[in-house]
Structure formats: structure tokens, C-alpha cells
Amino acid sequence: MKIGLPLALQECLTQLSFVALCAFVNRLGLTASSGYGVACKIVNFAMLIPSSLMQSMASFVSQNVGAGNEQRAKKSMFTGMGIGLVIGCVVFAFIMFKGNLLTAIFTTDAAVIENGFDYLKGFAPETILTAILFSMIGYFNGHDDTVWVMIQGLAQTLLVRLPLAYYMSIQPNASLTMIGLAAPVATVFGILLNGGRYIHNNRKK
């Protein structure tokens, strides 16, 4: 319960936040909504690598913490960041500059392709930033610090991503690019939170 409940609650609220994001995007019209739907398919695929890193990181860190090898656990987090950043930069470049080729896989409607590409342009930095954030989350999960993982995840979503996405959606010149930018901004906030937590924990030791 101590480990599973916070993660389950975070996942539930995260899924609800995606419903809210869809509502914000719907304000821009049917074409924008369709483009967002197409872009989300690509986003889900792009997030597979950092998600895999996070899961493997949690397992590796927990093994080393259990063996009393904290230094190796820390080293694995930074190694994961490095691997993720290299892959993330490649994915970023492709999504940022050739994202229309990816959206064209799912539709032949030119307007939907461009709207999907617009969202991907704002979202693109997320492919790099999550390499850092997800490695940190994996590190904390490996230490059974799941309550903190839940708190920082909810803070990102409720304090930054949703308010910023909503604000961008009600602007006179609202665009999917600006709404998409809410994700990497929230991730930067998450990196700062987790960085502070990491420093605080190490000072206590």
C-alpha cells in the first residue's frame, strides 16, 4: 500500500489531467482537436524510451540501495540521464523539424497534419527534459520515496501544466504550439523540485 497507493493515485489524477487538456484544445476547433489527437499518438511513442529508463532505473537503484551501495545508485541515475539525453536530442530534432512527416502517418488531411505538427513543436523540448526528470523519478522510486514522487507529479500537473495550458488556450492568438509548451515548462519545474529533494536528502546523510 505504501508504494502502490501513491503511484496509483498519481496515475489516476494524471489521466484526469489529460481529459482537461483535451477540453482546452477543443476550444480551438475540430481541426485543432484532431491534430492534437494525432500528435498524442506520436508523443506516447516518443515517451517510451524515458519511461523505460525510469522503470529500469527504479529496479537497479533499489537493488544497489538494498546492497548498501548508494554511490552506485547515484551513478546509475546520472548514467541514465546521459543515455536519455543522447537519445532525446535525436528524437527532439526529428520531431521539431520533421514532425509533419510523423503526423502524416496517421492522416492525409493537410490541416490536421499541420495542427499536429504545431503541437509537436511546443512539446519537442519534453523529449530531452524527461531524460533528466524520469531518471530522478526512477531514483526516488528505487528508494521507496513514492509519496514524494506523487507530490512532485501532482505539483507539476496542477500548479504548472494545467494552468499554463488553460491560459494559453484562452489567448486571442491561441495555438497548439503554445499549449504544447506547457509540458516542458512543467517538466523544468519538476526537475527543480526533484533537484532540491536530491540535494536535501544528501545533506541529511
Regions found by a protein language model. Name each.
Residues 1-5, 61-126, 169-205:
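Short alpha-helical transmembrane segments in multi-pass integral membrane proteins
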Residues 12-41, 45, 63-64, 103-110, ...:
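Helix-terminus/linker motif at the lipid-water interface of multi-pass membrane proteins
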Residues 51-54, 123-142, 148-160, 164, ...:
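Short runs within selected transmembrane alpha-helices of multi-pass transporters and secretion channels
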Residues 7, 11, 19, 23, ...:
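Transmembrane alpha-helix boundary and packing residues in multipass membrane permease domains
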Residues 1-20, 24, 45-49, 53, ...:
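Hydrophobic faces of transmembrane alpha-helices in multi-pass small-molecule transporters and flippases
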Residues 13, 17, 21, 25, ...:
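Alpha-helical membrane-inserting segments
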Residues 35-99, 130-152:
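Small-residue-rich hydrophobic transmembrane alpha-helices
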Residues 31-32, 146-147, 175-176:
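Membrane-helix interface segments
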